[in-house]
């Protein structure tokens, strides 16, 4: 199957500061891809380029195997971006939602199509058609912005923190609606979000972006420096509660340590490093049926994984204090 996106040797910077540096990255059509990373990691910049709003300084982004320029005809009506802060034009809800179709000169049965788009995001057309942009709450504005994109039935819907600054009810509607678009029309979804558990639950692929580079996929424990050497040959990260998270010698003091959740064990192996924390969440992973354990150890979140056959050996619940162990040899570096 041909990739809908193929990134090749992409580099971008702002005022001399590197923003993105991606050698290769691809997305297949009809899939859901999650992008996770801290603020300033380059997520928003990347989504703007995948929407063909901005152009990288170097490298190529192929769309369905072909080069594309910002706002070019072969991508203009096929990709659309929903940003964290929705931009609505200074006009009625109806005019905001119908605008894209009017640009396409595709205006047949417009009232019913606008009403259907509003229904998808849980807003009644009779109540909202004539409302002005300034009469909407934050959650309503985000839902109207999403409806204005869904009415186009896009091939690709890119979402940048779509639920970060709205009420819980609107956030859930948006989550449900974008999945409906993917199921109903085969829309390719690319989602940047701090809601890691939502992404892990719905995405075929989750990629981690840091300082403009992809450095891992799937559930991993990423532990950021700086690292401290309290004794010769012993390297640790000091946590806020006084615990030390031990690692092998890092390649640099700001290197990122990576530990696979499968190597975080509920045991007290005397040869292993240990860390104590509180269970904050238990998640049943749909694809593997494994139990995902989210543990908070002071200021560090840690993920462990239990296979179905081992899950019955433990009685776990949120709020419970547990001790996790790992081996130094299981720590890798980025």
Segments the model singles out, each with a brief description of its role:
Residues 36-38:
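The feature captures the beta-strand-to-loop junction immediately N-terminal to the Walker
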Residues 51:
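Helix-to-loop junction immediately C-terminal to a conserved catalytic motif
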Residues 67-80, 91, 103:
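ABC ATPase NBD coupling module
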Residues 109-127:
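Conserved ABC ATPase "signature" region
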Residues 237-334:
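Non-catalytic connector elements of ABC transporters
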């Amino acid at each position: 199957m041909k990739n809908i996106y193929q990134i090749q040797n992409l580099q971008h910077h702002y005022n001399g500061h590197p923003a993105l540096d991606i050698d290769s990255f691809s997305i297949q059509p009809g899939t859901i891809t999650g992008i996770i990373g801290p603020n300033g990691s380059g997520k928003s910049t990347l989504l703007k380029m995948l929407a063909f709003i901005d152009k990288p300084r170097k490298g190529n982004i192929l769309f369905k195997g072909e080069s594309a320029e910002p706002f070019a005809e072969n991508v203009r009506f096929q990709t659309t971006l929903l940003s964290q802060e929705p931009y609505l034009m200074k006009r009625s809800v109806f005019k905001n939602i119908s605008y894209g179709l009017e640009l396409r000169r595709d205006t047949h049965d417009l009232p019913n199509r606008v009403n259907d788009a509003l229904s998808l995001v849980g807003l009644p057309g009779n109540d909202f058609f004539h409302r002005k942009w300034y009469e909407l709450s934050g959650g309503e504005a985000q839902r109207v912005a999403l409806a204005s994109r869904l009415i186009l039935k896009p091939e690709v819907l890119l979402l940048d923190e779509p639920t970060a600054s709205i009420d819980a009810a609107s956030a859930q509607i948006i989550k449900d609606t974008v999945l409906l678009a993917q199921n109903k029309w085969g829309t390719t979804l690319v989602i940047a979000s701090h809601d890691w558990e939502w992404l892990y639950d719905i995405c075929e692929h989750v990629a981690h972006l840091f300082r403009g580079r992809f450095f891992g996929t799937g559930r991993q424990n990423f532990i950021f420096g700086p690292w401290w050497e309290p004794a010769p040959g012993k390297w640790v990260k000091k946590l806020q509660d006084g615990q030390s998270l031990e690692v092998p010698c890092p390649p640099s003091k700001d290197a990122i340590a990576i530990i696979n959740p499968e190597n975080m064990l509920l045991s007290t192996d005397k040869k292993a490093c240990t860390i104590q924390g509180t269970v904050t969440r238990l998640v049943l992973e749909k694809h593997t049926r494994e139990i995902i354990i989210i543990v908070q150890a002071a200021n560090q979140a840690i993920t462990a994984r239990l296979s179905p056959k081992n899950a019955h050996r433990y009685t776990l619940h949120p709020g419970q204090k547990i001790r996790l162990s790992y081996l130094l040899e299981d720590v890798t570096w980025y």
